[in-house]
Amino acid sequence: YLKHKGKRFRAFQGEYAYHFISWRYAKFRWKYIEDDVLRKGDALVLSVPFSGNGGDLKNIDKILKKCTRLKIPVLIDCCYSPLATNMSFNFDHPCIEYVSFSLSKIFPVGHLRIGMRLSRTDDDDQLFVYKSFNYKNRLSMKIGLDLIKKFDHDYI
C-alpha cells in the first residue's frame, strides 16, 4: 500500500475486509468501484477468486485492460485461491504489479503470517530489503511447507 499511498485505492464491495480496514487505519483515500469509474491516479486491489462470491468477477479482463490503458497499478490477492477448483486467470496484464498468496485461508495458521508476494520488478521496498538480508520467518516457512506437502488444497 505504501508504494501507492498518494493514489485512491479501489476495490469491489465484497472484497476481503483486510484491505478496507488497512486503508481506513492508514487514512488512505479509497472508494468502491461500484461508486465511481476507474480513473488515472487510482490503485486497484482484486481478489482471485473474488472473496465476495468465491468465483469470478464479471468483466475482469475488460477492467484489467482499462487499468493497463490508464496506468492503474493492480494487486491480485490470491488468498482464497487454495479453496478454488478449476480456477483460470490471466496474470499477463501489464497493469498487474503484485500477486500475493496466503496459507491462512486453507490452514489455521493466521498468526504465523505464511504467505508470499510476487512482483514483476524489484522496487526496493520493505519486503525486498528483508529478502536481500535473508530475513525470513523460517519456522513459519517450514510449517507452511510441511502443511502443503502433507495435505491437498481441498483437504479441509
Where are these regions (language model features)?
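Catalytic phosphate/metal-binding cores of nucleic-acid and nucleotide-processing enzymes, i.e., regions
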Residues: 1, 11, 37-43, 130-131, ...
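Conserved beta-loop-alpha segment that forms the PLP phosphate-binding cup at the N-terminus of a helix
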Residues: 1-9, 115
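Short, charged/polar "capping" segments at the starts of alpha-helices
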Residues: 15-22, 84-86
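Active-site phosphate-binding strand-loop segment of PLP-dependent enzymes
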Residues: 28-82
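A short alpha/beta connector and helix-capping loop motif
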Residues: 86-101
